[in-house]
C-alpha cells in the first residue's frame, strides 16, 4: 500500500498498523509525491492508498482529484482511503466527493482499519496484474 502522510510520527504509527495487518508499506510525504508515485508505478503496484488530508504543497483532496483525473485506468480504480483527523460528516462527504473510496478518522481504530482492508482487499481494482 501507499501511505501518504506528512507527519513522521503519524506515518510511523500508521505504517506499523498496516504492517501488523500483513501489508508492505511505501510512504509519500505529501500529495505531490503521492501523485508522482501513482503516475510512475506499474499498474497494480499499490493495492490501496491511505491519504492524509492536511499536507503541505498539495492536500489529500487535490492529490486524489489529480490521481483520479490521470489518463491511467489504474489511477481511476485504485482504492483511496482518507486517513485524517477531520472526522465530521462534512469531512467524510468532502473526501468521497474528491474521489476517495472510504474515510478513516485518526486516531485509527484497528478494527475499523481491518474492516476497510477487507472491504477493498479482494475487489478486482485492487488485484495485482498477472
Question: Model-predicted segments: where are they?
Answer:
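C-terminal compact regulatory domains
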Residues: 1-130
Amino acid at each position: 500500500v501507499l501511505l501518504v502522510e506528512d507527519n513522521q510520527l503519524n506515518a510511523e504509527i500508521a505504517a506499523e498498523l498496516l504492517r501488523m495487518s500483513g501489508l508492505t508499506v511505501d510512504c509519500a510525504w505529501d500529495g505531490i509525491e503521492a501523485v508522482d508515485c501513482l503516475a510512475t508505478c506499474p499498474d497494480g503496484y499499490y493495492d490501496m492508498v491511505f491519504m492524509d488530508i492536511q499536507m503541505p504543497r498539495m492536500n489529500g483532496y487535490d492529490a486524489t482529484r489529480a490521481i483520479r483525473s490521470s489518463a491511467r485506468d489504474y489511477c481511476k480504480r485504485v482504492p483511496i482511503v482518507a486517513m485524517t483527523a477531520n472526522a465530521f460528516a462534512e469531512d467524510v462527504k468532502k473526501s468521497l466527493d474528491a474521489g476517495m473510496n472510504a474515510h478513516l478518522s485518526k486516531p485509527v481504530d484497528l478494527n475499523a482499519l481491518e474492516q476497510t482492508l477487507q472491504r477493498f482487499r479482494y475487489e478486482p481494482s485492487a488485484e495485482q496484474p498477472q
